[in-house]
Swiss-Prot record:
This is Methionine--tRNA ligase. A motif ('HIGH' region) lies at residues 13-23. It catalyses: tRNA(Met) + L-methionine + ATP = L-methionyl-tRNA(Met) + AMP + diphosphate. Zn(2+) binds at residues 144, 147, 157, 160. The lineage of its organism: Bacteria, Pseudomonadati, Pseudomonadota, Betaproteobacteria, Nitrosomonadales. It comes from the Bacteria. InterPro entries: aa-tRNA-synth_I_CS (IPR001412), Anticodon_Met (IPR041872), Met-tRNA-synth_bsu_C (IPR004495), Met-tRNA_ligase_1 (IPR023458), Met-tRNA_synth (IPR014758), Methionyl/Leucyl_tRNA_Synth (IPR015413), MetRS_core (IPR033911), MetRS_Zn (IPR029038). One of its GO terms (cellular component) is cytosol.
Length: 728
């Protein structure tokens, strides 16, 4: 097999927050593919970096009273620790705030300028007079010009999905200072993506098929997944627009040459260029020559460049990035693989539900990172579909597959080999056992008596990123191995010394099956595979070991004493994990306030008691201090949806928008409101009420309603209030 030379990247995590389980989908997906390629002895270089520039980093550093570089250095170490904890095997992890990256950015800019693909234009922007800075789109909020939802970002509406210019917002305000922004003009630099040269290049590049590489069981490969190519075609058909690549000072980033330090490269220009900066720094550290660097970064070399990204950044990677590279003298990506998002238990990750889980928290709670690597692999395919982390399925699948099927083979057979046969395996097996072994090694291919080596089928699935199919095939082989052990019953054979030859044979064959499964699973479970190699007394396994003509280990091969390889997941561990990650919008309330809220909650979910004749309302409850009242976190919420609850006489199920997330609340207002009346309405909710498990689901708060025999009457804020606002 000829060696491939591949530069592989994952999208750069932003140096302004923690790595969470959603991020890990991409890094685990990439790492599995890289490890598989390396097991085939291809030359693969997996590089990444922290995306370390931009306004959010500048502002956060200011809030913390440190410099941006102090912030990004701290976050770099946090990210690297998280990635190491999940066995993400970067060959190099760097930062975009580097001299290499700056040199690449400036060179690309100069080449595009020389090719007349940079334009200078005056643009009108919002300016914060308090902070004395132009505001990025995401730091401007206001009322959507289409649906009039409040508290929407300056570039798109999360309520109706509309996109618009920040200057289109109604009643805009600065998310940095709260001030009303001013409109000011400034000269900006644009990459002319609308140029006919860019359009012609992209139309050809996007739909171009790539010749198969040596050792890949595909005649040609598409550059993009079909759904990604279709999306690109939509954007091309709508017409390409020029891309603003500059930002005004103050800004944390690289200054644009010949602008006197007043203009900076937009973070989205220098971020993908960071792939090149990281790669060059890595090769320099390993004393590689400029010619070797150019082989990967310049056109004409027999190398590949493969990007793994989330589907939300496809526009940047499949339009701007290749066009910039093509017209600045650099090589373009060979392939771009986009993946979907992660949901947890069928819903978006949520801090209130404890499902917005950081990598650090997962590891600190003592959960095995390879449990998650395996589960993601069992769910991932080659499409851009979202994947769901169902905790119930997570526990069941890991316990069944990894412990019950894979590790179980070794634990059931190793002891007999070490105790009765000095730890030595036999190569002499009966025809019956050889048939079992062949059934393990080969899988049916279509109809009839056509068979394919299972290692070839699994390899093809790994290559195409169809990991779920690879896992299914591997577990099918594991089923054969366990059926063999169950049929031969070594624990019964061991009771009579006259069965020693057969016992030796059965346990040796089973451990050879375990060895093959270890080869298959090694890209997914690198640490477990290493421990299995040590137990089996083997050098690091490669894919050749799955393809060997001598698939049984030699006669007399010695194994080591078996050590426990993996534990089962206890469901209580998941409960502790979600509990540790639950976060209210405000600190927990006191017991006195909890009792007050409980009383309010009862009143909101039942018909209020009628007032006595002649009374305007019910008597006041016992007093509480202003400090205790302040512990109740009241927030403005927008009702996104309302629906009847089957089997409930008084409840409506409300989906609420509180700006930072969505909440589900069951409210006892069915007698007074039709669901259709409530959609789009603003109300007030208790946001830090502990989630309560009800017969119909989990209620994540409580809406406020008044009543003294009539009603209930849902409380609504005055005009101008926006979702997420705190009621004071």
């Amino acid at each position: 097999m000829n060696k491939r030379k591949i530069l592989v990247t994952s999208a750069l995590p932003y140096a302004n927050g923690s790595i969470h389980l959603g991020h890990l989908v991409e890094y685990i997906q990439t790492d599995i593919w890289v490890r598989f390629q390396k097991m085939q002895e291809h030359e693969v270089h997996y590089v990444c970096a922290d995306d370390a520039h931009g306004t959010p980093i500048m502002l956060r550093a200011e809030q913390e009273g440190i410099t941006p570089r102090q912030l990004i250095d701290r976050v770099w170490h946090e990210h690297k620790t998280d990635f190491d904890g999940f066995h993400i095997g970067f060959d190099h992890y760097y930062t975009t705030d580097s001299p290499e990256n700056q040199a690449f950015c400036e060179d690309i800019y100069r080449q595009l300028r020389a090719g007349e693909l940079i334009a200078k234009r005056s643009v009108e922007q919002f300016y914060d007079p308090v902070k004395q800075m132009f505001l990025p789109d995401r730091y401007i909020k206001g009322e959507c010009p289409r649906c009039h939802a409040g508290d929407q970002y300056g570039d798109s509406c999360e309520a109706c999905g509309a996109t618009y210019l920040p200057t289109d917002l109604i009643s805009p305000y600065s998310a940095v200072s709260g001030a009303r922004p001013e409109r000011r003009t400034s000269n900006h630099y644009f990459f002319k993506l609308s140029d006919v040269r860019c359009e012609a290049f992209l139309k050809n590049w996007i739909f171009e098929s790539i010749p198969a590489q040596p050792g890949v069981a595909l005649e040609t490969r598409p550059r993009l997944q079909p759904e990604a190519a279709n999306k690109m075609n939509e954007w091309l058909s709508a017409g390409l627009v020029d891309w603003d690549i500059s930002r005004d000072a103050p800004y944390f980033g690289f200054p644009i040459p010949r602008t006197g330090g007043k203009k900076f490269f937009y973070v989205w220009l220098d971020a993908p260029v960071g792939y090149f900066g990281s790669f060059k720094n890595y090769f320099k550290q390993n004393q590689r020559t400029q010619a070797e660097i150019d082989e990967f970064l310049r056109p004409g070399g027999n190398t590949e460049m493969v990007h793994f990204i989330g589907k939300d950044i496809l526009y940047f990677h499949a339009l701007f990035w290749p066009a910039m590279l093509e017209f600045s003298g650099y090589r373009t990506p060979t392939q771009i693989y986009a993946h979907g998002f992660l949901t947890v238990n069928g819903q978006k990750m949520s801090k209130s539900r404890g499902t917005f889980i950081t990598a650090e928290s997962y590891l600190k709670q003592g959960l095995n990172p390879e449990w998650l690597r395996y589960y993601y692999a069992a769910k991932l395919n080659d499409s851009m579909e979202d994947i769901d982390l169902s905790f119930e399925d997570f526990v069941a699948r890991v316990n069944s597959d990894l412990v019950g099927k894979y590790v179980n083979i070794a634990s059931r057979c190793a002891g007999f080999i070490t105790k009765k046969f000095g730890g030595e395996l036999t190569h002499n097996v009966s025809e019956a056992s050889r048939k079992w072994f062949n059934q393990f090694l080969f899988c049916e291919l279509g109809e009839g008596d056509t068979f394919l080596g299972r290692h070839m089928s699994i390899a093809n699935f790994y290559e195409r990123r169809e990991y779920s199919k690879a896992i299914k095939e591997i577990m099918s082989a594991a089923d054969v191995a366990n059926q063999y052990v169950d049929r031969m019953k070594p624990w019964v054979l061991a009771k009579d010394s006259r069965n020693d030859r057969e016992l030796h044979e059965v346990c040796s064959v089973a451990l050879n099956m375990f060895r093959m499964l270890t080869v298959y699973l090694k890209p997914v479970l690198p640490k477990l595979a290493m421990e299995a190699e040590q137990f089996l007394g083997l050098d690091p396994l490669t894919w050749k070991d799955a393809n060997s003509q001598h698939r049984l280990l030699p006669d007399g091969h010695r194994i080591n004493d078996y050590q426990h390889l993996m534990t089962r997941i206890d469901p209580k561990q998941i409960e502790m994990l979600t509990h540790a990650n639950k976060e209210s919008l405000a600190p927990a309330k006191s017991q006195q306030v909890a009792q007050a809220v409980e009383t309010m909650e009862k009143n909101s979910s039942t018909t209020p008691a009628p007032a006595k004749e002649g009374e305007a309302g019910q008597a006041s409850a016992s007093t509480i201090s202003i400090e205790d009242f302040g512990k109740i976190d009241l927030r403005v919420a927008k009702i996104l949806d309302a629906e009847h609850v089957p089997g409930a006489d008084k409840l409506l199920k409300l989906t609420l928008d509180v700006a930072s997330e969505q909440r589900t609340v069951f409210a006892g207002i069915k007698s007074a409101y039709d669901p259709g009346q409530l959609k789009g309405r603003l109300t007030v909710m208790v946001a830090n009420l502990a989630p309560r498990k009800m017969k119909f689901g989990i209620s994540e708060g409580m809406v406020l309603a008044a009543g003294d025999g009539e009603g209930p009457y849902l409380l609504s804020p005055d005009e101008g209030a926006r979702p997420g606002m705190k009621v004071k």
